[in-house]
C-alpha cells in the first residue's frame, strides 16, 4: 500500500471529527447523551458487520475500507464528546482528575496488549473473524451504556437556543469567557501541532536512524504505552493535587526535554531513546487527563458537548497541519 493511500486512510480517521465536530457538539447537547453513545456504538458495529460479511466472500476493496473508516470516525466524533460530557454527571467533582488518570491507564493497556493479540489472532483466524471481534466489542459497549443510569439534564437542554449556528458559536463563547481554559486550548493545539509529526516519525527513527527492525518499533511503542500506563495510575492515585496547572506545565516540560534528548542521540543510543519514549508516555496523562478534568469542572454540563467537540475539532485540525 502506497504512502499516499496510508495518509488518506489516516486522514479519514480524524478529519470528520475536525470538520463536523462543532455541529456534532450541538446535537450532543440537544439530545439524550446516553442514546447518542449507544447509537454511535451501534453505527460502528454496523459498519464493521458490513466488512465482516464482505471479507467472508472476497478480498476487501480499499474504497470500502475507507468508507467504513469514515463512518467509524463519525461514530467516534459523537461518542467521545458525549462520554466526556456525561462523566461529571456520574463522577464527583473532586474525583474527576483521578477518573481521567485511570481512564488513560486503561487506554494504555489496550495499546500494549492489542498489537500482540492482533498478531496472534491474525496468525490463526481469518480477517473477517477478527473484524467480527471488533463488532462484538461495539455491541458490548452499547449494552454496557444501556444498563448504566445516566442523569439527564432535563430543562437545561430544553432551554437551548433553537438557532443551530448560534448554539455552535456558544461553545467558543463559553471557552473565551474562561481565559484560563481558552489559553489551555491554545497550548493543546500547539502541543498537537508539534508532537504529531514527531510521533509519526517514531517508526522511521527506529528503523532508519537506529538501524532497527520491526521489533525495535514495537519496543518503542510498548515503552511509550507503559509510561502512559504508569502516568495514568499515578494521576489516579494522586489526582487530588490542587496545583493542576503545575502538572500540565511539568508534563509539557517532560515531553520537551525527552524530545530534545531524542533528537541529539547518536545512532548507538537506541536504549536511551526507549527510555525517553517511556518518559514521553508518562507525561501524557498529566496533560490530557488533567485538561479533560478541568474542562469538566469549569464548564456547565449543558455546554460540555459543544466544548469538547470544539476542542477535539481544533486539535484534530492541528494534526494534519503539523504533519
UniProtKB/Swiss-Prot annotation:
Disulphide bridges? none
Top-level taxon of origin:
Bacteria
Residue stretches spanning the membrane? 6-26, 51-71, 105-125, 128-148, 182-202, 219-239, 245-265, 270-290, 303-323
State where the protein is found.
Answer: Cell membrane
User: GO CC: one term?
Assistant: plasma membrane
Q: Show the InterPro entries listed in the entry.
A: Drug_antiport, MFS, MFS_dom, MFS_trans_sf
- A GO term for molecular function: transmembrane transporter activity
- Identify the keywords attached in UniProt to this record, alphabetized: Antibiotic resistance, Cell membrane, Membrane, Transmembrane, Transmembrane helix, Transport
Q: What family does the entry list?
A: Belongs to the major facilitator superfamily. Drug:H(+) antiporter-3 (DHA3) (TC 2.A.1.21) family.
User: What is this protein's name?
Assistant: Macrolide efflux protein A
Amino acid at each position: 500500500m502506497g504512502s499516499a493511500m496510508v495518509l488518506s486512510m489516516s486522514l479519514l480517521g480524524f478529519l470528520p471529527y475536525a470538520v463536523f465536530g462543532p455541529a456534532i457538539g450541538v446535537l450532543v447537547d440537544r439530545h439524550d447523551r446516553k442514546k447518542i453513545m449507544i447509537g454511535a456504538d451501534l453505527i460502528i458495529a454496523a459498519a464493521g458487520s458490513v466488512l465482516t460479511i464482505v471479507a467472508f466472500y472476497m478480498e476487501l476493496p480499499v474504497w470500502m475500507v475507507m468508507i467504513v473508516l469514515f463512518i467509524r470516525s463519525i461514530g467516534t466524533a459523537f461518542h467521545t464528546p458525549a462520554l466526556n460530557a456525561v462523566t461529571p454527571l456520574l463522577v464527583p467533582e473532586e474525583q474527576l482528575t483521578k477518573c481521567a488518570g485511570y481512564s488513560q491507564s486503561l487506554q494504555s493497556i489496550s495499546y500494549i496488549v492489542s498489537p500482540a493479540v492482533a498478531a496472534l489472532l491474525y496468525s490463526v483466524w481469518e480477517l473477517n473473524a477478527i473484524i467480527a471481534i471488533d463488532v462484538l466489542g461495539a455491541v458490548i459497549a452499547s449494552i454496557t451504556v444501556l444498563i448504566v443510569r445516566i442523569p439527564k439534564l432535563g430543562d437545561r437542554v430544553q432551554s437551548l437556543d433553537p438557532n443551530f449556528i448560534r448554539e455552535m458559536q456558544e461553545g467558543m463563547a463559553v471557552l473565551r469567557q474562561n481565559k484560563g481554559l481558552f489559553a489551555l486550548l491554545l497550548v493543546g493545539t500547539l502541543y498537537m501541532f508539534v508532537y504529531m509529526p514527531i510521533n509519526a516519525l517514531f517508526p522511521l527513527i527506529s528503523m532508519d536512524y537506529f538501524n532497527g527492525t520491526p521489533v525495535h518499533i514495537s519496543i518503542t511503542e510498548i515503552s511509550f504505552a507503559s509510561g502512559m500506563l504508569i502516568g495514568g495510575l499515578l494521576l489516579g492515585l494522586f489526582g487530588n493535587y490542587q496545583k493542576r496547572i503545575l502538572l500540565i506545565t511539568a508534563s509539557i516540560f517532560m515531553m520537551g526535554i525527552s524530545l530534545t534528548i531524542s533528537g541529539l542521540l547518536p545512532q548507538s543510543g537506541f536504549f536511551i531513546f526507549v527510555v525517553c519514549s517511556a518518559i514521553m508516555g508518562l507525561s501524557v496523562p498529566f496533560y490530557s487527563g488533567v485538561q479533560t478534568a478541568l474542562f469538566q469542572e469549569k464548564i456547565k454540563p449543558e455546554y460540555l458537548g459543544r466544548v469538547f467537540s470544539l476542542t477535539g475539532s481544533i486539535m484534530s485540525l492541528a494534526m494534519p497541519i503539523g504533519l
